[in-house]
Amino acid sequence: MHTMLRKISLAFLSALIFQAQPVSAQITGGQQVFQFMTLSPSARITALGGAQIAVKDDDLAFAAANPAALNPQMDGMLTFQHNFFLTDIQHGYVAYAQHVPKLGFTFHGGLQYMNYGDINQADEYGTVIGKVKASETAFTVGGARPLTDRISLGLNVRLGLSTLDTYKASALAADAGLMYADTASRFIAAVVVRNAGAQLSSYNEVREDLPFDLQIGISKQLRYLPFRLSIIAHHLQQWNIRHNDPNLQDDGILQLGDTQSSTGGGNNAVDNFFRHLVFNGEFLLGRNESFRIRVGYNHLRKKELSVRNYRSLAGFSGGIGIRISRFRIDLGYAAYHLAGGVVHLGIGTRLKDFF
């Protein structure tokens, strides 16, 4: 039974990857719709550079990034995450999980929201004639089960809805993940296919691509130091993810100032390689790892959002997490641009602890 399930799971994961390949030719901004589904679902992930698929504990928010992270430790967990995004945009995620022992599955349901607030409505002369509202929502359900003692499989199905004044659009997407977790060596490896799917309806009857993303991640908790180091590779379905601007010259790979170039083939290849990577680390301190310090670096964000000749911390992130009584509280900050960054707050608890 388990052998057959593993074969079906691997075949399904492969089908998702190859089905989505033709529609994922570009990741440049403006090329895909429902981009809000790519945002970090939690304060912890925000602090870790915006990507983390290789952790398996009781943090339910990880299931939004990798459904294979679902496990019995999340039974009865409720999480609420709110992101104070740029320009007063409000973004958040709320979810609940339940383990079903008879089936061997852990299920979860979640709601992601993005509220852009009121936007000025103007006529062809630029005269403001009113206000319009814009928002996006995604409903997610998913489940996971172990295939072996170390390998688990998970699947999410997501319905996305978008509203701009009287215009509406919808999309159906799926995530599939496999995770290998060796508890003895504290090593985890994972592969995830995210947002494979298509639009169901659009604003103007023109169907556009969803933000498909193939990710591979590894994490290792050190033996003699309470520290977990992770490397997450993203957008692996496309090698070249550089945005070449001939007006800019790149003098290096990791410099604090800005950025982008269409020259210097050797440096460009190295730079492009690192744009696929997110590096992060997490200190696990105190009894039961109740206090955590997190740092992250997202090279793609650094290179795309830095301003030439100005030093900034774009691409860097950090945060803390603490357990107080029955609650897990997380705070994350990510520097996006000289104009500012985002603050992410998360609260999680186990409902069964109150009854």
Predicted regions and their residues:
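Subset of outer-membrane beta-barrel
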Residues: 26-355
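Sec/Tat signal peptide C-region and signal peptidase I cleavage site
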Residues: 19-25
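Short alpha-helical "patches" and their helix-cap loops
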Residues: 8-11, 335-337
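Bacterial N-terminal signal peptides
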Residues: 9-19
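N-terminal secretory signal peptides that target proteins for export/translocation
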Residues: 1-5
